Amino acid sequence: MMSYSLRVADLPAGDRPREKLLSQGARYLSSAELLAILLGTGQGAGKLSAVGLGQFILKQLGERTGDSTDAVSALRDITPEELMAIPGVGPAKATTILAAVELGKRVFQSRPGEQTIIDSPALAAAVLAADLMWQATERFAVLLLDVRHRLLGSHVITVGTATETLAHPREIFREAVRRNASRLIIAHNHPSGNLSPSQADLDLTKQILQAGQLMEIPVLDHLILGNGDYQSLREITPLWQQVPQGDGSA
């Protein structure tokens, strides 16, 4: 194993994981830095620091998944024994990591109750997380809202394979009419964790937006969920400018 003697305490204050989290927010920390906060310490004098150990753990996980760019996903179902097989990770560090992973899952799976006003993509993703976030196959779901954006319910429209799912606008709007919904948010998951929309995703979104115009039921967003994160297509594509929904926002 490569020697890494620089301690976290020797880093400039702005580069230390805890200080960086407090000053910039958790989103701006690398996965290795987040692990370092959980680990607390590294392997001891003259060996890997906490950040170095975090990097080493991710390297080991990347080898386990066969994809170094998606190492974090291996934490989803890892066992204590598998973690403790990594040099420098004993029972205390392993249980801390596993507790954090489980807490993160529970946060994402805790959904707002009906009548909650859904006023952001993050809140919509929280409602849909239990149905979409960690699934091994693609699913397409719809979030049903009233005219004031209050939550009426959610419904999984279709379940596909590990790489694709199919949904037809007819099925989506049938559920909206059945529940007397005035607004919709559609969503599907990418089991790979890659949240970039495919051309098929964009084409389907445009079809559904056009159907929303005809039905006079605005489609507020299309979310892609996966691996603990989400992407709003309304925020990153011009589709809502091309097919306005008459919902009072551009």
Curated annotation (Swiss-Prot):
Keyword Lipid biosynthesis attributed: no
Gene3D superfamilies named among the record's database cross-references: Cytidine Deaminase, domain 2
All copies of domain MPN, residue ranges: 116-239
Identification of the protein by name: UPF0758 protein tlr1707
Family: Belongs to the UPF0758 family.
Top-level division of the source organism's lineage: Bacteria
Residues annotated as signal peptide: none
Database matches in PANTHER family: DNA REPAIR PROTEIN RADC, UPF0758 PROTEIN YEES-RELATED
Organism ancestry: Bacteria, Bacillati, Cyanobacteriota, Cyanophyceae, Acaryochloridales
Motif (JAMM motif): 188-201
Keyword flag Protein transport: no
Record keywords: Hydrolase, Metal-binding, Metalloprotease, Protease, Zinc
Binding-site residues for Zn(2+), renumbered to this chain: 188, 190, 201
Pfam families to which the protein is assigned, alphabetical: RadC, UPF0758_N
GO molecular function, one term: metallopeptidase activity
Biological process terms in GO annotation: DNA repair; proteolysis
